[in-house]
């Protein structure tokens, strides 16, 4: 049994009473009804497709009501993360982001790209920003092509972080040169989140 199958077997089921009787949901499907999305684990194309689909579904259900994304991710594939980022900016509902555990690399970028004033971190969460990673082999011309591509990606990611944090491009470029870990309080001071939450605020309860 692989790790994914084991994890799925551990997902709790909840039973809801309806006018038609009882209905069982896995916990994540039930929370999706409350407009809560969980971005947990490495970001790859499969996860990105799931997150994008959930965002589009919730927009279709109610384009005026906020969506909340809980993030606990070490990062992952840049293009997969950008698919989620672009969809967050594309849809009409405001997307609130909440860091639980960690938001590293692309996870940190997605955390910072939530709606202004609605980006949160829990007190003991960690945020890490850095430049994109790349390792290539093959013919010299192919290596050169990939090197130019990763430099272009780095420049674009720096622009996005600068836009959402309010930091200058020069500051972002310097601070992402190496792995840069921040506490929740430091992430707030840097502009990656707007508030550190010890308890859920009333507006978050009402929006979900």
Swiss-Prot record:
The lineage of its organism: Bacteria, Pseudomonadati, Pseudomonadota, Gammaproteobacteria, Lysobacterales. It is an enzyme of class 3 (hydrolase). Fourteen ClpP subunits assemble into 2 heptameric rings which stack back to back to give a disk-like structure with a central cavity, resembling the structure of eukaryotic proteasomes. This is ATP-dependent Clp protease proteolytic subunit. GO terms for cellular component: cytoplasm; endopeptidase Clp complex. One of its GO terms (molecular function) is ATP-dependent peptidase activity. The keyword Lipid biosynthesis does not apply. It comes from Xylella fastidiosa (strain 9a5c). It catalyses: Hydrolysis of proteins to small peptides in the presence of ATP and magnesium. alpha-casein is the usual test substrate. In the absence of ATP, only oligopeptides shorter than five residues are hydrolyzed (such as succinyl-Leu-Tyr-|-NHMec, and Leu-Tyr-Leu-|-Tyr-Trp, in which cleavage of the -Tyr-|-Leu- and -Tyr-|-Trp bonds also occurs). It is found in: Cytoplasm. The keyword Hydrolase applies. Keywords: Cytoplasm, Hydrolase, Protease, Serine protease. Its main location: cytoplasm.
């Amino acid at each position: 049994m692989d790790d994914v199958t084991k994890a799925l077997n551990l997902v709790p089921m909840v039973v809801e009473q309806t006018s038609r009787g009882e209905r069982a949901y896995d916990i994540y499907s039930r929370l999706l009804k409350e407009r809560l999305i969980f971005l947990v684990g490495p970001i790859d194309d499969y996860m990105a497709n799931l997150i994008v689909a959930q965002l589009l579904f919730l927009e279709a259900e109610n384009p005026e009501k906020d969506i909340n994304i809980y993030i606990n991710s070490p990062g992952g594939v840049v293009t997969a993360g950008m698919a989620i980022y672009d969809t967050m900016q594309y849809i009409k509902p405001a997307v609130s982001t909440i860091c639980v555990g960690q938001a590293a690399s692309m996870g940190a970028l997605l955390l910072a790209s939530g709606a202004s004033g609605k980006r949160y971190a829990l007190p003991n969460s960690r945020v890490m920003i850095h430049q994109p990673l790349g390792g290539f082999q093959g013919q010299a011309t192919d290596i050169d092509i990939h090197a130019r591509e990763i430099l272009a990606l780095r420049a674009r990611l720096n622009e996005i972080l600068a836009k959402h944090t309010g930091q200058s491009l020069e500051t972002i470029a310097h601070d992402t040169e190496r792995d840069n870990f921040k506490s929740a309080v430091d992430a707030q001071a840097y502009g990656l989140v707007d508030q550190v939450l010890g308890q859920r605020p009333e507006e978050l309860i009402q929006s979900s």
